[in-house]
């Protein structure tokens, strides 16, 4: 598979191509940990969700959590990936205080999921296909706390043993925009599947980003890994900063050292942490306490049959069934909750074919716009899907105009209430009586003879007359009827 061309970076010696691969660590949505029955609940008191297995007490043996296996397979299917019916757990050996076993149980040569791909949407309607190298299961380590004492570090093992899916991409990403789009799309897929909540603030989704630079078409450069980035915007900033650093070093005659770095968002730069380890440094070998993980194709087929509709499928359906533009459909399906809200609006409409596109416009422009302005999410929207559907239906029926609909939306947002009852009680119905509209049109034309003469020479001035009629009618006149009457009477 050929990577999609990205934005080249300018250097003193010309253009440079950035080559990016990513390792996403996604915490598996499961009530208990990968190899123990301890809770995975976030936010408990330190060391309150810990079993004897998690802290490697002598004689304690790991037992695989079948739900975590199911979630990994479901994720692999969602990534259009090969599911391996036999996989092996290995010990990844390194010593660090947050890993009480002295090793991490992971998967090395035989992961549970093989190659797949993710298609991401880019600016300008472009797309890029990013290859997935593999997905494997492993344990999350505990958490070191260095700010509790001036002389001591503490360890919270609540997270230790929580199941992680490490999703490794191929080096197909070519710029910061593609990197952000990839993580955004991957997080969306995981949320649709219900296999990871994707909450980067809580550490449920973390990214390690491998960056190298080269002259376009040249051999791959030496890569550096930027660890544990917990924000999509920071991912873009880190890629830009690290690529710029490498370009400057090479153009100054230096060489890039393969190392692990971290991103400092306050200074907008990456800093060295340690030299980059190779696989042999970890002395992987199969875990003798765990048998190879094996299941049959029927197990996979049953999970595949029960998968929900994923973002790409939902987007295609919205375009085909409701005539939405690819952009509007992408906005609606980006988050599972947004798509569900739109579909709830559609369910409440009697004429979805007529009002589906109008409903999308109102969800995206009016509702999302207002939610973003006030820093709310869809779950806390003061306007329900049923209320928004009623507003859309009133427009579609011709009961209210678009302008009146915006006023109605403000009332429902601030005060609540049934939109149909509000239209009746507040006299907001659109005027469709041609005689009444014609009377207003005649009055406006009679009062502005100079504008009439100008409009005959410049037909675009008809818009001024439309505005005056709508103003005079309090926004209640049917806009199409106003347009038709004005064109007829002005002879344009």
Swiss-Prot record:
EC number: 6.3.5.-
Keywords: ATP-binding, Ligase, Nucleotide-binding, Protein biosynthesis
Entry keyword Ligase: yes
UniProt keyword NADP, yes or no: no
Catalytic activity: L-glutamyl-tRNA(Gln) + L-glutamine + ATP + H2O = L-glutaminyl-tRNA(Gln) + L-glutamate + ADP + phosphate + H(+); L-aspartyl-tRNA(Asn) + L-glutamine + ATP + H2O = L-asparaginyl-tRNA(Asn) + L-glutamate + ADP + phosphate + 2 H(+)
GO biological process, one term: translation
MF terms in GO: asparaginyl-tRNA synthase (glutamine-hydrolyzing) activity; ATP binding; glutaminyl-tRNA synthase (glutamine-hydrolyzing) activity
Gene3D superfamilies listed in its UniProt record: 1.10.10.410, GatB domain, N-terminal subdomain
A Pfam entry, by short name: GatB_N
Enzymatic class: ligase
Entry similarity comment: Belongs to the GatB/GatE family. GatB subfamily.
Functional description taken from the UniProt entry: Allows the formation of correctly charged Asn-tRNA(Asn) or Gln-tRNA(Gln) through the transamidation of misacylated Asp-tRNA(Asn) or Glu-tRNA(Gln) in organisms which lack either or both of asparaginyl-tRNA or glutaminyl-tRNA synthetases. The reaction takes place in the presence of glutamine and ATP through an activated phospho-Asp-tRNA(Asn) or phospho-Glu-tRNA(Gln).
Quaternary structure and interacting proteins, as annotated: Heterotrimer of A, B and C subunits.
Protein name per Swiss-Prot or TrEMBL: Aspartyl/glutamyl-tRNA(Asn/Gln) amidotransferase subunit B
This protein's encoding gene: gatB
């Amino acid at each position: 598979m050929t990577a999609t061309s990205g934005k080249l970076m300018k250097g003193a010696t010309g253009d440079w191509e950035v080559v990016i691969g990513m390792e996403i660590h996604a915490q598996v949505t499961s009530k208990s940990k990968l190899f123990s029955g301890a809770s995975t609940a976030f936010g408990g008191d330190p060391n309150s969700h810990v079993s004897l297995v998690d802290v490697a007490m002598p004689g304690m043996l790991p037992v695989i959590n079948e739900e975590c296996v199911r979630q990994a397979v479901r994720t692999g299917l969602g990534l259009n990936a090969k599911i391996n019916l036999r996989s092996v757990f290995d010990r990844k050996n390194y010593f660090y205080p947050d890993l009480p076993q002295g090793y991490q149980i992971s998967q090395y040569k035989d992961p549970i999921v093989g190659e797949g791909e993710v298609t991401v949407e880019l600016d300008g309607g472009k797309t890029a296909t990013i290859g997935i190298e593999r997905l494997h299961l492993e344990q999350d380590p505990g958490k070191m706390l260095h700010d509790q004492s001036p002389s001591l570090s503490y360890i919270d093992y609540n997270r230790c043993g929580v199941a992680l899916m490490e999703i490794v991409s191929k080096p197909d990403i070519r710029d910061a925009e593609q990197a952000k789009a990839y993580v955004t799309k991957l997080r969306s897929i995981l949320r649709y599947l219900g296999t990871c909540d994707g909450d980067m603030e809580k550490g449920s989704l973390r990214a390690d980003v491998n960056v190298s630079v080269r002259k376009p078409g040249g051999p791959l450069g030496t890569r550096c890994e930027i660890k544990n980035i917990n924000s999509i915007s920071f991912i873009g900033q880190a890629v830009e900063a690290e690529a710029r650093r490498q370009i400057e070093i090479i153009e100054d005659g230096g060489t890039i050292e393969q190392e692990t770095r971290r991103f400092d968002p306050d200074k907008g730069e990456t800093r060295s942490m340690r030299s980059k380890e190779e696989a042999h440094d970890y002395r992987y070998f199969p875990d003798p306490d765990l048998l190879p993980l094996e299941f049959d194709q029927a197990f996979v087929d049953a999970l595949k049959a029960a998968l929900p509709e994923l973002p790409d499928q939902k987007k295609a359906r919205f375009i085909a069934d409701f005539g939405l533009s690819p952009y509007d459909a992408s906005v609606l399906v980006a988050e599972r909750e947004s798509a569900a809200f739109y579909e709830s609006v559609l369910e409440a409409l009697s004429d979805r074919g007529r009002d589906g596109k109008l409903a999308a416009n109102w969800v995206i422009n009016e509702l999302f716009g207002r939610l973003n302005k006030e820093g709310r999410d869809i779950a806390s929207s003061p306007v329900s899907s049923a209320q928004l559907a009623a507003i859309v239906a009133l427009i579609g029926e011709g009961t209210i105009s678009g302008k009146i609909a915006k006023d109605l939306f403000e009332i429902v947002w601030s005060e609540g209430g049934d939109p149909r009852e509000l239209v009746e009680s507040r006299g907001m119905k659109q005027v469709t009586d041609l005689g009444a509209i014609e009377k207003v049109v005649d009055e406006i034309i009679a009062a502005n003879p100079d504008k009439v003469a100008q409009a005959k020479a410049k037909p675009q001035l008809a818009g001024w007359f439309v505005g005056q009629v709508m103003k005079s009618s309090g926004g209640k006149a049917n806009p199409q009827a106003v347009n038709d009457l004005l064109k007829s009477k002005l002879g344009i």
